[in-house]
Amino acid sequence: MTENSDKVPIALVGPDDVEFCSPPAYAAVTVKPSSPARLLKVGAVVLISGAVLLLLGAIGAFYFWKGSDNHIYNVHYTMSINGKLQDGSMEIDAGNNLETFKMGSGAEEAVEVNDFQNGITGIRFAGGEKCYIKAQVKARIPEVGTMTKQSISSELEGKIMPVKYEENSLIWVAGDQPVKDNSFLSSKVLELCGDLPIFWLKPTYPKEIQRERRELVRKIVTTTTTRRLRSGPQGTPAPGRPNNGTRPSVQEDAEPFNPDNPYHQQEGESMTFDPRLDHEGICCIECRRSYTHCQKICEPLGGYHPWPYNYQGCRSACRVIMPCSWWVARILGMV
């Protein structure tokens, strides 16, 4: 069976029909250049925005400076140590409850940080291989106002501070082993010490002073014993006095020896806290004017302890002590 199919002839396309087969042509678009006025407007907006940001930053910095100005204050002074003039500075940071004292410069610089918040004092000497800490009473430093700063400046600036350096005063000797756990130290003390090993300072007195103190304690004990013997036997107390059952003994009230407490009484010594300072360690009770108080920081000699000198390599760390009358009147704002 034969299938018949109709053949459709292909139409010939002439030259006139080429434009119908060609792809559509894209019309040319003319880009209109930006006008100068538009560019000026954009530039003006950018400049105004930058000026506003700068103004806001300046205002913020001003208020930040004004706020921190009441918490931190620096003052510079001059001190005479062994006939040699040295520069010193004191920084009061009431916001962080810190005092920082610097003495000397270069290889003779000594820095002392009093952390009243945690009750720790850190001391470091330039070129030294150790950093030292000692116990410090906890206190609160009030804010320093503008009038107070002017008063401090008039009290210290441009004057040579007298130095009190008593030969019979206590001497601070470093411990034999460094502190293993320094987590109790503040960031300021850790920043002061850096990578140096930290050693506790233990107070000691010259042997002559210790001998005098032992003699005084021996006399007190002898006098107390004599009075007890005169009061009669223990079973028959004198009239008006309680018996031993109600009267506490001295040994019962005495605290046990604590080798980690640098302020503990040892060998009949009194408390090592400087009696010229008040209980907060900020000012001087008996002083009528400011002075520079220096203390000796020494290294252990490692020899026989009863030897007259069991320390070596002493260096001095000095700080300014203000009269308590001035401190209370000015710092606390009572006048």
UniProtKB/Swiss-Prot annotation:
Glycans are attached at residues 223, 236, 244. Nasal and articular cartilage, and fetal epiphysis. The keyword Disulfide bond applies. Residues 221-269 are annotated as: Disordered. One of its GO terms (cellular component) is extracellular region. Residues 211-214 form a propeptide. Keywords: Chondrogenesis, Cleavage on pair of basic residues, Developmental protein, Differentiation, Disulfide bond, Extracellular matrix, Glycoprotein, Membrane, Secreted, Transmembrane, Transmembrane helix. Gene3D superfamilies: 3.30.390.150. SMART domains: BRICHOS. After cleavage, the post-translationally modified ChM-I is secreted as a glycoprotein. Two other smaller nonglycosylated chondromodulin forms (9 kDa and 7 kDa) are found either in developing articular cartilage or in chondrocytes. The 9 kDa form could be processed by an extracellular matrix-associated protease as a metalloproteinase and the 7 kDa form could be processed intracellularly. Residues 104-201 form the BRICHOS domain. One of its GO terms (biological process) is negative regulation of endothelial cell proliferation. Disulfide bonds join 131-193, 283-287, 284-324, 294-318, 298-314. Pfam families: BRICHOS. Signal peptide: none annotated. The chain crosses the membrane at residues 45-65. Bifunctional growth regulator that stimulates the growth of cultured chondrocytes in the presence of basic fibroblast growth factor (FGF) but inhibits the growth of cultured vascular endothelial cells. May contribute to the rapid growth of cartilage and vascular invasion prior to the replacement of cartilage by bone during endochondral bone development. Inhibits in vitro tube formation and mobilization of endothelial cells. Plays a role as antiangiogenic factor in cardiac valves to suppress neovascularization. Belongs to the chondromodulin-1 family. This is Leukocyte cell-derived chemotaxin 1. It comes from Bos taurus (Bovine). The gene is CNMD.
